Amino acid sequence: MLSVLGMTYGDEEKLETLKYRLLTGSEKDLGSWGHEYIRHLALEIGQEYQNRLNAEKEVQDLIDLSLSLVPYFLSHNAEADAVDLLSELEIIDEITQFLDENTYPRVCLYMVSMVNLLTYPEDQQFLRTAHEIYVRYNELTKAIVLAIRLNDTELIKNDLNATSDKSLKRQMAFLIARQQIWLEPQAEDEEDQAFMECLTNTSVPKHFKSLGKELNILDPVMPEDIYKTHLESSRGAGLTNVDSARHNLASAFVNSFANAGFGNDKMMLVEGDKGPWVWKTKDDGMLSTTASLGMLLHRDVEVGLDKIDKYTYATEDQIKAGALLAIGLLNSGVRIYSDPALALLSDTDNLDAKNVPMRVASIMGLGLAYAGSNKEELLEVLLPIVEDVSLDMQLSAMAAVSLGLIFVGSSNHQVSEAIATTLMDEERQKQLKDKWTRFMALGLALLYFGRQEEVDVILDILKAVDHPMAKPTSVLASVCAWAGTGTVLKLQELLHICNDIIEENDEKKGDELVQSYAVLGLSLIAMGEEVGQDMILRQFGHLMHYGASNIRKAVPLAMGLITPSNPQMKVYDTLSRYSHDNDNDVAINAIFAMGLCGAGTKNARLAQLLRQLASYYHRDQNTLFMVRIAQGLLHMGKGTMTLNPFHTDRQVLSRVSAAGLLTVLVSMIDAKQFILGEHHYLLYFLITAMYPRFLVTLDEDLQPLTVNVRVGQAVDVVGQAGRPKSITGWQTQSTPVLLAHGERAELEDEKYIPLSSTLEGLVILRKVSIPWSPELRRNAADPRNRTLTLRNK
């Protein structure tokens, strides 16, 4: 009784409700005092726990008491309170013993949505606990999504092998392939041809083309269709002094982005009199133009190798180099067991060729073809190039980036040691002022992508390096390690870096890069979480007002990185203002960011803004080139692709996609030295992030199945009572359909159960003869459900 009175009377600091409850000793009649009392008690337990931790006192009695409150919360639809209480006491793994069939979905949903707001290692603990619960209740597709988020290969393998249901395994293989994880399958799975197709991503081109057929967009588009020159003001038409080779190169890029993955166009894959577009460009332009074949035929390896083959015998070295890069682009994101890319690109004639472009193209091609694969054989090929100090910095740096992409997020110690040793080497230190050094740093940073505190080892090593490049490298490494986590403390650290005023001295260049990377880091870390994104966008406004030129240059890029393929009015209107900035570098980066924001969306407002910019900058070659690139990005895949690294209902961050985006943005910090200079082929790193934004439904034999789905704006239903609708403002469409950013689909047809928890990408449907209900969905993975269906038939 005193405990209950303590709730209404007395000093809150004294925690009397808890004090008298602990003196009672009995925990039987807790619920009889009502919900308000239990919540008050939970609040005081949290406060007392902190007090005792600070005073280093025993806390076992508090833990026992809180565990007796959990069943009450769960039985009264207060799952959030139960999770919060156990989280406060750092014993979240205890929740598994209190759950049942009815309570676990809501508890897991709340736990998973909390992860973005937690710090390391608590976020990992939450994901592992939720994973364990899903496995216990046979929700394997939900479990494997969490295993993918944890980047734990052993967990992923265990989930995949936890069932003998072939269709379910194939669905999980689709989820693994979407994250570009290369798993070694078991012997019996290897014999299942269909399963291997799912795991290696080789079925994507087929379904992508069937989507194109459905939407009636198989006809290739020409750059002129995108530029719509007749809509640009005629004021500059007669006055342009654009170098035609440069203009043709821009058209080659636009053509490759717009027709990406469709395997047909009117410029490169043509026979007869017109001849391919390559001959209309010159020097380095030939390299990028030939490489665009890989983008056009993306993932369609058998056909692609055939088409690219003739270019490998060309007499011009630039065209040969382009063909090698095209092979890398073609194989990006698919896995072929015969390893054609490795055989062709690691051939000594190409890797040790006399001219630099061929070597660079081979190295970059290997990085793109095997991104995320952790393939050990590539260490023997690329590590010597990183370690050889006599080589040109460009080659070693590109090899470092390729290794960073191949072993992204694996913290592979062989690669990190090799790059760190190279950075410390006395011979190399003389060359570290080279513009390519930033890619050496990036290669090291990518190894620790998403590894959080594991990066501290490398940061300590970098403190020992006495060179201006050491600081930018450590900033890059730490932002990659915390990418997508939304960690507030890291964001504050980066804002402090941007606050520093750089003094004029020898180290100025390094310090300028530190600030530029810090700005990119702000959006890379805040990416995964919406509140953080809004806060950072506001900070970018301040940085543009008060920052030095090196910071102002990076802000538009960071704005593009925070919302790729998600054109928000507030973002692209701001970028549109920056695109007329007095500082030409800022304007160029803002234009590229506009392309990034609208990539693959064909947003009409953005298209109009870019057309206006094309006529405004008709005399400025560099800026006009960038406007064309942005127009190409906007029409990527004829409006069917996305560059956003988040997938599976925006839960999972694809490391490979984010790494590719970051590589392009790092080169854009000094656009005039790289992309606007001779190294425009660096734009092709975007291919790692390109993926069709479709929903294709398949039957259990993996044949396309047309069903009706509702597509609408996703609604957050965490912690809401009952079974609220998870989409709003929906329209009914028949599959295959396109999903814009922030949209979600629900099945309308009750005859089928989706085997995946989220309707996105490739989804297998299982037919049931009794009407669908949420309980049935839960048992979809259960083999007993299939016998029930057969019996009903």
Walk through the language-model features, giving the residues of each:
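Substrate/cofactor-recognition hotspot
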Residues: 366
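Active-site nucleophile and cofactor-binding loops and adjacent substrate-binding regions
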Residues: 358
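Long internal repeat-built scaffold domains in very large eukaryotic proteins
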Residues: 1-317, 330-354, 372-793
